[in-house]
Amino acid sequence: MIPRNLVISIVIMLAALAGLGLYGLHLRRQAAELLKAEADTKPVAPPASGPTGQITILTPDDDHGDLVRRQVAAALPPEPALRAREIVHVLISQWQEKNSTHPIAPSADVKEVFLLDNNKTAIVDVNGAFADQHRSGVLVEELTMASLARTLGANIAGLQQVKVIVDGRERETLAGHADLTGFYSTNLDWHVE
């Protein structure tokens, strides 16, 4: 016969193991709910004020490796930096649409755009989700950068170069491939349809 204290110890250990298993399931459910809630809590930017006008956006087509030129109506503020921010916001919104040819995280957004050197240089500050949740790959990342630079260049007269920073800080790469330490020309030689 098995000693009584050994039976009690085994029963206590099995009960503790069952309790830890239930606690683990509880934590897993909480983490899943937290991730879902985080994805749904993208801050809503106030609507841009200003007259509605047509802007040219160049959206990436990941399947064909090119940029597609489109005209989109948007409310554009008169101040150049706010106007540039709204242009980038509209572009990112196009990428976030359900049937986008270049999908990006729903929580990705532009924080600020700074125009320097008499509007010849743009510094685009994006949020962490833009880079952290961006799909990795040379073509996908370069299409993102080309789309940003060419779209801003098509809508801001005299703009020559664009730099992207993440949460106000320089970052080496977008998602492991596209170099964010330098500037991207608004005249990138990229196939546009």
Across the structure, where does each feature detected by a protein language model lie?
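Bimodal "functional hotspot" detector
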Residues: M1-E193
